[in-house]
Amino acid sequence: MTAADQQVGIVLPVLNEQQALPDMFDVLRGLNPAPAEVLFVDGGSTDASCDLIREAGFRVLETATGRAVQINAGVAAVQAELVCILHADTAPPGDMVQVIRDTMADRRIALASFTPLIKGPDKTRWVTTFHNWIKTWYAPLITRPHLFIRGVRLLFGDHAMFFRRRQFLEIGGCTPSDAVMEEADLCVKFARLGKIRMVRRWVQTSDRRIAAWGPLKANWIYFKVGILWAVGARSRMAKDYPDIR
């Protein structure tokens, strides 16, 4: 792998994230080695998100609302060969860039991610963390068994997924019409090119949805939205996945 192939860009799709952004700025500044690029992609925030990003010295690209649209625009706009999609409420380890480089040095891997640890100010959500981990396997096994046999595993937004930019563009990126579960189709597409791997390193992701909905409701929503994706009821997914910001 050449030096150019080792460049890592971070794309952060955001919408009304002014509360989470200051902590994220600190996380990004603390990464060692530093990424070659950091690009925030704002989907029409009505709060101070864009102003905060610019004031902190980071680039922001403004697009239409929709995480799939934002991710596609962000990946197209960066130049780094390795790209990580990071949510504003998810904190990666300090050596994130090196982990990405080491993982993607294996050319057999097309798509990879970290392992999310769901945590709030007062507690770690171990049950939901376990559910989040195991559904990577059971979701494709139940909903797409023929693809599971071929090696498809489903990674999600809070996993901090990463991949090669040229391959993302080659497969057409995320399905633009997907408001949620945009990562699921991406996994199916990437599985045609190689292995999907979840690296055994934590990223700490906020429990704000669980805090707002309660653990039982949150896990039910996660399960239901997955089933809606599986049966092709895409128009209902966003309705059944309410925004908590």
Regions found by a protein language model. Give the residues of each.
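Glycine-rich, basic loop-to-helix element that forms the pyrophosphate-binding segment
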Residues: 62-78
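Short aromatic/hydrophobic "clamp" motif used to bind/position activated sugar donors
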Residues: 83
